[in-house]
Amino acid sequence: MLTALLLSGCMGNNLGEVRATEPLQTGTFQKPYEQLAACTKQRIETDSWIFGQPIVQSSQDTNRPLIRVYAIYSRSTLFEVTFQPTHSAMTTVEYRRGYDGHGTQDQTWAIIEYCSRQAAPPTPGADRRP
């Protein structure tokens, strides 16, 4: 019984396991990848979730232009969303779900779509005249 408890507690905990899975949903958006990732991360952090508030983290790949946003709840990786620019100034987004992330895909994808329609934040100092 202890083994079963330990195994069930470890299911889905490993971010590497989530990253190794095929994406459940993929899309391309006409928004710079940094802006889309930042907006998505902020909305995931502030939206209400049926299970409670997840811990949301992000990382930028050092070898290529790729941002990863992932949510953790109760020491388990719920999902990861990756943002990567394309050659045509678009962003490819991929959603992967962890073992305990059931019920998060629709809400997460709705956040991504919402963020893709938002205006770009103003550039600091853009309203100044030389």
Residue ranges of model-derived segments:
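Bacterial Sec signal peptide processing site at the extreme N-terminus
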Residues: 4-25
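Post-signal-peptide N-terminal segment of Sec-exported extracytoplasmic proteins
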Residues: 25-67, 78
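Mid-chain, structured segments of secreted extracytoplasmic proteins
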Residues: 61-94
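Sequence contexts marking disulfide-bonded cysteines in secreted/extracellular proteins
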Residues: 11, 38-40, 114-116
